[in-house]
Every structure is written in C-alpha cells, then in structure tokens.
Amino acid sequence: MAMLGLVLSVLTTILALSEARIPGVYNGGGWETAHATFYGGSDASGTMGGACGYGNLYSQGYGVNTAALSTALFNNGFSCGACFELKCASDPKWCHSGSPSIFITATNFCPPNFAQPSDNGGWCNPPRPHFDLAMPMFLKIAEYRAGIVPVSFRRVPCRKRGGIRFTINGFRYFNLVLVTNVAGAGNIVRLGVKGTHTSWMTMSRNWGQNWQSNSVLVGQSLSFRVTSSDRRSSTSWNIAPANWKFGQTFMGKNFRV
C-alpha cells in the first residue's frame, strides 16, 4: 500500500507539472499597413486609465510605450496587452530617417468618429487599422507636425520583467481580477481560478482585462490559469494565500519569450 501511495503521489506531481508547462514560444505575425496618430500630451499623462483597465500605466510597467487601437484591431478588448512593432512608412517628408522601430503595448481603445470620413478625421472608423500612439512614441518615428503618418506594423512577442500580475478587487460575492504584465502573446482570452476548496472555474471577462467570478473565494488560497491568444497556458499555483485581501496584487508564472 505504501508503494501504491508513492506511485500515486509521483503521478499527481507529474500531472500538475504538465498542466503548468508552457510549451513553445510566441513568434508574432507578418507585416501589415495602417496609420498612426498621437494623443495624451508630451508626458503621456492623458493615456492613463483606458479601456483595458490597466489604470496607471507607469506603475503597471507599461510606461509611454503604449497605444490605443481602432475597432479593427481592438477586438472588443481581447487585444489588450498585445505587443506591436511599428515603423513610419512611405512618407519621407515626415518619417524620421532610417525608419526606426518602436515597440508598444495595446492599452486603450480609439473610438470611431462617424461624423468624420475615415480618411479625414475618422481615423479609427472601421474597418481601418489604426494606432493612436502615446505622443512620446509617435515622436520617435515621425515629426510632430505630421499629425498622422502611414505605418507598417506587426505583432511581436511581449517582453516583460517579472511574472504575470493578478490584482484582486471586488467584494465577497464579486471577484474582479485584473491581469497585467503578460509576456509572450500578451493578450489573454481565458482565465481560470481555483480555490483551495473548489475545482477549476472559468472566469468571465467583464471589460478590458478585468475578469470576474461570483463565487465566494475569500479564505481560500487561489491558483490562476491564464490562456493567451496563441492558446498557450500558464498555471500559477496557490499564489494568493488564504488570508489574501481585496486590492492586493500577486505575481504568477509568466510565458517564455
């Protein structure tokens, strides 16, 4: 019986490790064309908050390397956290020489303006792919006076320091978890939570990268399982202790890049 117990323990450990494994590395995508404008002021203070729910982009680690995406790219919020490489293209009058690249994270939504034509003011109208860059990032690729420039862009792996962060907000019967600092594909499409006394439960996306559960999780240590848009998953076991409090942030395992 002792031997059987040892075998079962080993098998359980192997299964747990296999569930937590992160196979492969996100490779990004091919080059496409779009246009870019800017917003938020010279210090990017006007970019704080936003439709992804990240709040203070400085304290969350995104800084000024951010952009608001048009409807065609935003994907109803599922693109939040995705990373892009951009270059100013085909406009020698306004593009900086050498076509330097910038790398940004999607943190906001650029709403359409149907009162303006899509080629004159309604830059974020569907089906146009468009980036409204934080002003400091726009100035890295083009002159301020340009206002709007054509760009080439592609999805790239997100390179982040540290682990995935889970910030738990809400109250006893409403848990709202903000997920930030995701490496690899960057944007997540599924989030699961497991308490000490529960099975795995799928959380529903509330808005941006805020995910909700109406289960009572207070008093239990919590594990989270993140699935990114490239279908890789990362499981962070028992990262929130049983005495966790609303408003706290916990760090889990990130994706390899």
UniProtKB/Swiss-Prot annotation:
It is a peripheral membrane protein. GO terms for biological process: plant-type cell wall loosening; syncytium formation. It comes from Arabidopsis thaliana (Mouse-ear cress). Causes loosening and extension of plant cell walls by disrupting non-covalent bonding between cellulose microfibrils and matrix glucans. No enzymatic activity has been found. Its main location: secreted. Belongs to the expansin family. Expansin A subfamily. Residues 173-252 form the Expansin-like CBD domain. Keywords: Cell wall, Cell wall biogenesis/degradation, Disulfide bond, Membrane, Secreted, Signal. Disulfide bonds join C52-C80, C83-C158, C88-C95. SUPFAM superfamilies: Barwin-like endoglucanases, PHL pollen allergen. PANTHER family: EXPANSIN-A15. Residues 49-163 form the Expansin-like EG45 domain. The gene is EXPA6. The keyword Transport does not apply. Residues 1-20 form the signal peptide. It is found in: Secreted, Cell wall; Membrane. This is Expansin-A6. One of its GO terms (cellular component) is extracellular region. The keyword Cell wall biogenesis/degradation applies. InterPro entries: Expan_Lol_pI, Expansin, Expansin/allergen_DPBB_dom, Expansin_CBD, Expansin_CBD_sf, RlpA-like_DPBB, RlpA-like_sf.
